[in-house]
């Protein structure tokens, strides 16, 4: 049974992959959704390169079915005062002291956030998203208010960019996963290989799953040989390998 309704067609701007390749690409995208659901903020999130259409909608609905909480859509042009929060004028006047109006990032604590048109995220707002991904918090210090709120978020960066358009590099490097959907036909989208119970089972065992020291060393050496020296990237790789192991039933070293 399909986890979500399947649309009838898909409008794509890129040539479609051959059927077998497209089916494999969809299975990879499906696995990526399961990994995001298992890891949440541990993976930062995922970059989804795709134009609006039924395949992207189906993938987002699939992720919602894995998390059982719909992703909250946040436009990329959401300003600082709405992202971080600020003084609630009405309540401040009522109580005669500064009262905080919670921002979007704090409202989305422990939730999945779909950042619409991430390729157009203004530079002046990028730092707020990156800080929340780095620390799991947002800090506000203005209008007589100094407050830190939890903001552990999982970001789905919806990248609709064409040609040279791309989300800010600082955001991309904080997302552990990336998929592209535009070359997948809706006809190649099939039933999910994973269920909500698989996600919950993997989550419950994740903290008890370890990567052997030898494998960690090999991963670090491989990353260095490829010119990758980011500890964040290495951590993403380790966490993703553990989640893959739990979803596939294979040893971590195989992943």
Which residues are covered by each model-predicted region?
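Short, well-structured alpha-helical interface segments that form or flank functional binding sites
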Residues: 124, 170, 214, 232, ...
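An alpha-helix initiation/capping motif
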Residues: 53, 57, 217, 235-239
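Alpha-helix N-cap/helix-start motif at coil-to-helix transitions, marked by capping-box chemistry
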Residues: 77, 209-213, 235
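Alpha-helix initiation and N-capping motif
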Residues: 56, 80, 196-199, 216, ...
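Phosphate-sensing "switch" segment of ASCE/P-loop ATPases
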Residues: 146-226
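C-terminal helical "lid" subdomain and adjoining coupling/linker elements of P-loop NTPases
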Residues: 222-255
């Amino acid at each position: 049974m399909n986890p979500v309704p399947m649309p009838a067609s898909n409008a794509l701007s890129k040539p479609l992959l051959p059927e077998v390749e497209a089916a494999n690409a969809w299975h990879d995208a499906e696995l990526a959704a399961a990994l995001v659901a298992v890891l949440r903020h541990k993976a930062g999130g995922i970059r989804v390169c795709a134009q609006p259409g039924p395949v992207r909608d189906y993938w987002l609905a699939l992720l919602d079915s894995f998390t059982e909480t719909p992703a909250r859509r946040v436009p990329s042009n959401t300003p600082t005062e709405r992202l971080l929060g600020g003084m609630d004028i009405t309540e401040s006047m009522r109580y005669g002291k500064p009262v905080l109006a919670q921002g979007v990032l704090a409202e989305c604590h422990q939730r999945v956030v779909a950042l619409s048109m991430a390729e157009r995220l203004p530079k002046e707002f990028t730092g707020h998203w990156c800080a929340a991904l780095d620390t799991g918090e947002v800090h506000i210090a203005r209008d007589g208010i100094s407050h830190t709120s939890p903001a552990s978020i999982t970001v789905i960066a919806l990248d609709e960019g064409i040609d040279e358009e791309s989300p800010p590099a600082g955001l991309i490097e904080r997302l552990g996963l990336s998929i592209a959907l535009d070359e997948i036909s809706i006809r190649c989208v099939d039933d999910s290989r994973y269920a909500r119970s698989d996600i919950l089972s993997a989550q419950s065992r994740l903290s008890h799953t370890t990567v052997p020291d030898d494998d960690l060393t090999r991963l670090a050496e491989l990353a260095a040989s490829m010119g990758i020296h980011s500890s964040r990237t290495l951590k993403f790789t380790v966490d993703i390998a553990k989640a893959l192991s739990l979803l596939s039933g294979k040893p971590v070293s195989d992943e």
